[in-house]
């Protein structure tokens, strides 16, 4: 049985790799302007000083370069983790399996995501001036080192991503399971996209304060207090400075971006998986 199962696992791994990469790149490029607006709203500089509506595509290059490998690594880990945990626990479609697999996937994906976010967000808020994404990363490494430069905000990014995934993926899997019983229609890439949009929008709204903290830490200048403050102290400082609205800065573009992104991402992921599955069956 193990020998028969092995090629299927490898095939699923390959499908997740390709489908995740395609879906991630499509989303990041198509919805990049919304992400820029969100980042500038959350910046310590304020929206207009961070660039306003100028240069709305600044930072696209590092985002495009990093989106495919980040998404591919995430979905490979998620699908393989889900398959492994389901076999170990002898359960199928358990929300706890989805939560554990998504959490592990987020930690690994952040190894690529965090340096990409550093380059992208500093470009978006015009901190990189006319430097390329690679130049921004090299400068961060030379002046601040690996941990405080290239991987600044690693902890706060995980602190944002894991709660986000703990909400999003069980919801997405649950909505997919309920689609046919509730509607009477078979699952399609469109239905998967719709489920992803709703799950993503809910998750994005609830985790906005964590996203604000992550943005503040990544954009902090060398002399900024945010470089040395804990996430809790940064949240408290934002609340004292701007009140409740400060904690949810960028709420509308974040929810819009991830709702649309969820539709694109999960829809393209499902479509690509189906195409690859049909191709491998033909051969």
Curated annotation (Swiss-Prot):
Membrane disposition: Multi-pass membrane protein
GO cellular component, one term: mitochondrial inner membrane
Bilayer-crossing regions: 14-34, 55-75, 99-119, 152-172, 190-210, 248-268
Alphabetical keyword list: Membrane, Mitochondrion, Mitochondrion inner membrane, Repeat, S-adenosyl-L-methionine, Transmembrane, Transmembrane helix, Transport
The Solcar repeat ranges on this chain: 11-84, 93-178, 187-275
GO annotation (BP), single: S-adenosyl-L-methionine transport
Subcellular location: Mitochondrion inner membrane
InterPro entries: Mit_carrier (IPR002067), Mitochondrial_sb/sol_carrier (IPR018108), Mt_carrier_dom_sf (IPR023395)
Disruption phenotype: RNAi-mediated knockdown results in extended lifespan.
Gene Ontology MF, one: S-adenosyl-L-methionine transmembrane transporter activity
Biological function: Mitochondrial solute carriers shuttle metabolites, nucleotides, and cofactors through the mitochondrial inner membrane. May mediate the transport of S-adenosylmethionine (SAM) into the mitochondria.
Family membership: Belongs to the mitochondrial carrier (TC 2.A.29) family.
Protein name, as recorded: S-adenosylmethionine mitochondrial carrier protein homolog
Protein's organism: Drosophila melanogaster (Fruit fly)
